[in-house]
């Protein structure tokens, strides 16, 4: 599959979450039954990233018993044009449509599409998520710094309306900037470890928590400081759309509550109850 990635022809979606299995991913129900040289997939996924434009989806499905939880999951690669696959885009409040709902109606997939060993899909998923939670944090930090500079320039424009009444501009912008510096300082170590081929543990959860807080603080600052300009007019449309999207950052890729639970368990060694 590497040539299609290098040429830009390959685009894969991530089929993890379900309606009843989001933060508790190990509760997923999408089923993969072995029949001869194939797996037969039945079930559905939601919030599948880029499924509408993807040519393949790496799917986390249950090959074990329902009570097997994470020990009974397998990762299987599916082509979106296989018979029985239906993709429906999900339009978000932000206006974006990068997520989709996917239905699998007895989709027959060659057993050679299994990634890793049967029953070990959880380990594959966690390996992938460390990149989503960590490398993504480093990338987004750069984007958010650029957006903060754009906001600062907008507020500094002498021809623009004054900031919202009572807004302590320097204090708000300074606080957001310090949060972004903390995110970069935390995530750079994670990115270096990933680049060196090392496995990242709960550090990725810390990166994910910081990213969610920073993402929302940047756009909350825009909403607060721009005042009425934020709510009306085409000039602020991008800010409004990005503010809506920032609401999801403490949910997607593992909610903030889940990340705190990982840190509490694996770093702080707190009791389960």
How should these model regions be labeled?
Residues 30-33:
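A structural signal for short hydrophobic beta-strand segments in well-ordered beta-sheet cores
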Residues 124-127, 131-134, 226-273:
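Glycine-rich phosphate/cofactor-binding loops in nucleotide/flavin-utilizing enzymes
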Residues 46-51, 93-94, 248-255:
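Glycine-rich phosphate/pyrophosphate-binding beta-alpha loops
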Residues 156, 160-164, 170, 181-237:
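C-terminal helix-coil-helix/basic helical segment that borders enzyme active sites and/or dimer interfaces
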Residues 38, 42-88:
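A short core secondary-structure module
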Residues 8-17, 60:
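A short, Trp-centered hydrophobic/proline-enriched beta-strand micro-motif
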Residues 85-182, 249:
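Glycine-rich beta->alpha junctions and the first turn(s) of the following alpha-helix
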Residues 20-28:
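Active-site-adjacent elements of ketosynthase-type condensing enzymes
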């Amino acid at each position: 599959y590497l040539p299609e990635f290098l040429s830009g022809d390959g685009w894969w979606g991530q089929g993890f979450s379900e309606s009843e299995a989001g933060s508790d991913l190990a509760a997923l129900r999408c089923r993969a039954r072995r029949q001869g040289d194939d797996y037969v997939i039945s079930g559905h996924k939601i919030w599948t990233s880029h499924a509408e434009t993807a040519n393949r989806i790496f799917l986390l499905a249950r090959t074990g018993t329902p009570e097997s939880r994470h020990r009974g999951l397998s990762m299987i690669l599916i082509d979106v044009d296989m018979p029985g696959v239906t993709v429906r885009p999900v339009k978000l409040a932000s206006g974006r449509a990068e997520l989709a709902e996917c239905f699998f109606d007895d989709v027959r997939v060659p057993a050679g599409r299994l990634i890793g060993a049967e029953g070990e899909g959880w380990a594959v998923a966690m390996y992938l998520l460390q990149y989503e939670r960590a490398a993504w944090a480093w990338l987004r930090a750069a984007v958010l710094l650029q957006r903060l500079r754009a906001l600062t320039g907008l507020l500094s424009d002498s021809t623009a309306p004054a900031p919202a009444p009572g807004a302590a501009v320097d204090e708000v912008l300074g606080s957001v900037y310090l949060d972004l510096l903390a995110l970069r300082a935390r995530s750079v170590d994670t990115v270096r470890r990933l680049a060196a081929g090392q496995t990242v543990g709960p550090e990725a959860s810390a990166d994910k928590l910081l990213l969610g807080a920073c993402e929302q603080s940047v756009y909350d600052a825009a909403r607060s400081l721009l005042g009425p300009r934020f709510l009306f007019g085409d000039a602020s449309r991008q800010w409004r759309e990005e503010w809506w999207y920032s609401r999801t950052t403490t949910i997607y890729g593992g909610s903030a509550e889940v990340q705190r639970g990982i840190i509490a368990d694996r770093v702080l060694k707190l009791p389960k109850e």
